[in-house]
Amino acid sequence: MKLKIISIIALISISLSVNAQTQKSSDGNEAASKTLFELSPFERAVCCIRFYEGLHRKKDYPYVGYGHKLRPGERYSSNMTAREAEVLLRKDLRELCAMFRSYGQDSLLLAALAYNIGPYKVLGCKGRYPKSTVLKKLEA
């Protein structure tokens, strides 16, 4: 458990030095390059996940895009473009944020953690996984 906490702290400290990639506005013009702290928290999470997950390919099955684990019945291709992978990442992250909505400002933190290790390892699953230490501390 200590290793996980140290890993999370290292991830956060490393991500502070990562610059966000150039964003395109809706009219197609490139906006000026922004640093990570000039982005919204949700955009920061997307940038960090994209950076550390990388684009998964056929050899990474059952993971596609930026770490999306295929669910039964889903038909996403392992050859998806970076844009398609980002759309899927944003969709997954929004779903996880909604799952943790009751935790208020910490919902994005929990969503990013759940994207990495799975929501049931954060929430706990009777008989399989205990509730995560991070969640226990937030509830205290």
Q: What is the predicted function of each stretch?
A:
Residues 5-14:
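Sec-dependent N-terminal signal peptides
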Residues 16-108, 112-140:
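Cell-wall polysaccharide-cleaving catalytic domain and substrate-binding groove, primarily
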